[in-house]
Amino acid sequence: MATETSTLYDTVLILDFGSQYSHLITRRVRELGVYCELQPCTVKLADLKFKPKGIILSGGPNSVYEEGSPHVDPAVWTYGVPILGICYGLQEIAWNLKGEVKPGDHREFGQADVTLDAAATASLFAGITSPTRVWMSHGDQLSKLPEGFVVLAHTPTSPYTAIGNLDRKIFGLQFHPEVTHTTHGSQMLRNFVVGICGCSNNWSMNSFIDFEIERIRTVVGEHGHVIGAVSGGVDSTVAAALLSRAIGDRFHAILVDNGLLRLNEAAEAEHKLREQLKVNLK
């Protein structure tokens, strides 16, 4: 049986509430040398094949107080690992831990200067000076702190811009640290995944590629063959390149032209796969 990457490296679980930035959170964490996996927000922790060192709750377009809005597995709150909620994720923390969330007086969208409170310097905002510029994108806001939480940062219009329960290592941000508009966003994420979660930042894309190639060889075996459909898009092209590097001509790629490709795109995809990536294209 092939080994999963998440069992070899310290792994952060990112729960996706439908934010346009969810994949960007994943990218930013991996850029820090920490492996992470993006899963639907409804995933059951008991179904995971790994034990995460920390959990990040993404933003999302819903309101936590509305019927039908997505919520995490209740086991998240007793799992015992650090949690970081971003935007909707902060509101999800408050909604589940006896805080209060309400519609804001107006939507906040764009850059804002955040003032750090005294409790901030020893945790999520270590090494960051006040004020710091962040990127807001929200309509709802926290109106009452959950039990055991303190304010870490605020703005004139958002008194609970960042909150934390320092004992339980649960933190919430009403802004997006993953976007480049947040000046020290990468440092905040590093403080969480490395400083608070204790993850080793020893993962890299090169090591991931080498690992996946060996995993493919283990699964396929010395004499096995694989047939795969490719479209020329990023996902199928990366998969084809990995399979080709792993098992050579024992991977048989079939280019699928569904009639909806752009002018000359099928020919360009064929050239890229056959000539540049040396994929065994049928």
Q: Residue locations for each model-derived region?
A:
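RNA-binding accessory domains that recognize and position tRNA/RNA substrates
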Residues: 1-57, 61-72, 77-82, 91, ...
